[in-house]
């Protein structure tokens, strides 16, 4: 809903060419703002109302391994904590009513980007496993109440509420 907030420890945002084309493909921005082709400033930390299109972004080299999605009005949320050394990037997909009528926010911890494996491999931006090699990672999901914005989620799942907006 438009009352939803996304907090992540991101610095950079890269626009994927998928979507409604509001931002220049592969353009780079500072979290949480993205400037559209028309000069409009989008705040990716706030979910816009339905009907606002659809887009896909990469948040490379996040500072810590977590993200939080909070309903600011109800003051409830969900967070995910994961090992940053395994998943150093986030993918952010927003279908805001403009793609198949879906209204959703999808945040995915990722080992590489972009989502096209051949391109990620060409750019040296994907993880590799040797034949027979296995990878295990501990991922922690947390639910919380009484918080409108998140400053940080500690590795053990402790929510640190933002006191004056979010530093990210």
Regions found by a protein language model. Give the residues of each.
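A structural signal for short secondary-structure junctions
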Residues: 60-63, 71-74, 97-101, 129-135
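Terminal connector regions
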Residues: 145-168
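Short Pro-Gly-centered flexible turn/kink motifs
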Residues: 127-145
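A conserved acidic, glycine/proline-rich C-terminal tail/linker
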Residues: 112-128
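Active-site/ligand-binding surface loops and adjacent short beta/alpha elements
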Residues: 1-79
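Hydrophobic residues positioned within well-ordered beta-strands of beta-sheet architectures
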Residues: 65-67, 105, 137
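A broadly conserved detector of short glycine/acidic/proline-rich loop/turn motifs that flank catalytic sites
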Residues: 12, 19, 73, 84, ...
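Glycine-rich active-site loops that engage anionic ligands at enzyme catalytic sites
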Residues: 70-112
């Amino acid at each position: 809903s438009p009352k939803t907030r996304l907090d992540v420890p991101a610095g950079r945002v890269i626009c994927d060419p998928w979507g409604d084309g509001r931002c220049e493909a592969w353009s780079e921005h500072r979290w949480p703002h993205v400037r559209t082709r028309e000069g409009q400033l989008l705040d990716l930390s706030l979910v816009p109302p339905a009907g606002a299109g659809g887009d896909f972004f990469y948040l490379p080299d996040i500072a810590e391994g977590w993200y939080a999605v909070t309903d600011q009005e109800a003051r409830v949320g969900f967070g995910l904590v994961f090992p940053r050394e395994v998943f150093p990037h986030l993918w952010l997909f927003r279908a805001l009513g403009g793609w198949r009528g879906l209204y959703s926010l999808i945040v995915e911890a990722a080992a590489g980007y972009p989502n096209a494996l051949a391109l990620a491999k060409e750019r040296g931006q994907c993880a590799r496993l040797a034949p027979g090699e296995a990878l295990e990672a501990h991922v922690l999901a947390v639910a919380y109440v009484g918080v409108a914005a998140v400053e940080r989620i500690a590795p053990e799942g402790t929510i640190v509420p933002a006191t004056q907006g979010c530093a990210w």
